[in-house]
Amino acid sequence: WKDKTFNGYHRADGQVGTKNVWLFIPLVFCENKNIEKLKDIFENELLPKKEVSYKNLLRSLIEEKSVEEVAEKNSNENLLDNIEVKFINHQGGCGGIRQDSELLAKLLAGYVNNPNVAGATVLSLGCQNLQVDIFKKALKEINPNCDKEILIYEQQQIGTTDQMFQMVIKDSYEAIKRANKIERKPAPISKLSIGLE
């Protein structure tokens, strides 16, 4: 097995993932609504649904277009075909005791540190127990060499929800485009991460 390789996504810290994922996560449950809005926006505009592709395929075949024509059209529709975008929400980050927030910070930092994750957009309200500094500290403790692109937005510092959404959408889209350019390259089997840390 020593000479075996797999094609993976190489991260700056030396980890290698089998997937290329961008995460959207809230530090507090109060941001779940905004995460859900972003999910709706990004899934509808950025990530074409498979069912729609299949419907378009059938519609094109009914219109007597060749399978090759349809495949070429569909390949041009999804410009970001080398990355997945995932949205996480939870019910913590505010109430409870400080240790609850610290444990949640470690959990969320673990998600971001996963070798399959290229980067993340993190939403914070600003007044919750799980502050941005606690999250950053948890990430550094898990992986001091983590150099992933992490976009963090504190809603109360930005101003209106509309202003925040404009920033988050613009910045995240640009970051996702950059992450989409990461290509699979051979890596030794020893770099393969299996299971949970």
Region spans (language model):
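Metallocofactor- and cofactor-centric catalytic cores in central/energy metabolism, strongly enriched
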Residues: W1-E197
